Amino acid sequence: TTGTSSTDRIEGMIKNAIYGIITAKACGVKEPTVGILNVDGARQTEKELKRLQEGGYDIRFTESSRSDGGCVMRGNGVLRATPDIMVMDSLTGNVMSKMLSSFTTGGSYEASGFGYGPGIGEGYKNLVMIISRASGTPVIANAIRYAAQLVRGKVFDVADAEFKAAKKAGLDKILSELKAAREKS
C-alpha cells in the first residue's frame, strides 16, 4: 500500500505492516511473513509490532538471510524477496516501487510490477488501486489482475477481521502511546 497510512513514520510502518498482512491474506497467503526494511524507525517499528504479537496478534516475522538474522532487512532481503511483506514508510515504498518497476527502462517507464498497491484502511469499502503516469501497459494490466484477486479474496472482510484482531491485541493503545510520545518531544 502507499501513502494512505500516516504522516508519522513509525505509526505508518505499523499500519503498513497490518495493511500488508491484509493484502497478502486476501491474495491467498495464509500465513504471510513480515520483514522490516532497515530505515529510520525500523527498530521502533519492530518493537511495537512485537508488542502486538505478544498481545495475541498473529504476525509472523521472517528471518534475514544475513548471518545476523532478525526481521530487519537490508537490500539483499528486498532483492531476494525474503519476506512476503516488506514493511517501510510510504515515501521509501514509493521510491522502491518506482526503482524496481522501471530499472529495465532506465527509470522513464514502469515496465514491470503491479502498481503501487491498493489503498487499504480501516472501514474502507471501495477498492482503489494506485498507479502513476509512468505506469506502462504491463503494470496497468497487472494492477487490474491484482484488484480482481483482492476482490475474489474478499479484501474488505479480511481487513475487518485483521483490524479487529489488531485492536484486541492493543493496536489503539500502541498508536496512542506513540502519539503522546511525539507530542512530548
Identify the residue ranges that each predicted region occupies.
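A generic structural motif
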Residues: 61-69, 158-163
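Glycine-rich phosphate/nucleotide-binding loop
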Residues: 73-172, 181
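Short, acidic/small-residue loops that bind anionic groups at enzyme active sites
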Residues: 1-3, 8, 59-67, 108-120
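Short, glycine-/small-residue-rich phosphate/pyrophosphate-handling segment
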Residues: 1-27, 32, 126-154
